[in-house]
Amino acid sequence: MMDIFLAILPAIFWGSIVLFNVKLGGGPYSQTLGTTFGALIFSIVVYIFMKPVLTPTVIGVGVVSGLFWALGQANQLKSIDLMGVSRTMPISTGLQLVATTLFGVIVFHEWSTTISVVLGILALVCIIIGVILTSLQSEEEKNAEQAANFKRGIVILLISTVGYLVYVVVIRLFNVDGWSALLPQAVGMVLGGILLTFKHHPFNKYAIRNIIPGLIWAAGNMFLFISQPRVGVATSFSLSQMGIIISTLGGILILGEKKTKRQLTGIVVGIVFIIAAGIMLGIAKS
């Protein structure tokens, strides 16, 4: 039971990050910068206690991974600014699952059995259905301005997905240990955060406030590393997708994002489809 609890913690931590970002304020640029500094602080503390070996490869790969994480996070927060948390997060999660899955299949040949192929295809279908259901628009949102924001938000999310994809796969391509990559990743995140935001004057009180989400993100990362050897990569991957419940429903219940009954139904059912897809992909990976 304790092992499963540890495996659920990343979902709880990561699912709450955007809620903290929005509540703490400051816009996407200050939020991005503050989050990266929070991750760096946490990673320095972990490094002091864990003392992982840092080779040139680990440092280089970790920094590149962190740079692309910053690209993913900054654009996800921009999309949230346009579309809201409860709409952005299910779509973002779905796009990330599709991207990482297809990359895993094409490059790493993850679906090696008939069962994994069937489960994988079913999962991708579930993701598409889930994303469509969570994207339902109300009549008010069909006006020109809202429609333009939605289209722009989707394009920005595609860029975000590329960032998150490279952040994940570059570590795997070079077979770098997660604990070893943690500090170089955080350095890359800060560098990426500065490069992406400095033109927008993000160094303010909101950036300092948003150090908190960065600490939360890094804590979630740490618990993922702890839980994977205990429950396996497949289970930890599946459980980590549950964060979508916290972020999406939190956007509605905590941040007060308004939804029609039709949209609420679509969001709930869509989340179920995306979570089911995450579980199936976890099984297909095992």
UniProtKB/Swiss-Prot annotation:
It is found in: Cell membrane. GO terms for molecular function: carbohydrate transmembrane transporter activity. Its main location: membrane. It is a multi-pass membrane protein. Pfam families: Sugar_transport (PF06800). Keywords: Cell membrane, Membrane, Sugar transport, Transmembrane, Transmembrane helix, Transport. This is Probable glucose uptake protein GlcU. The gene is glcU.
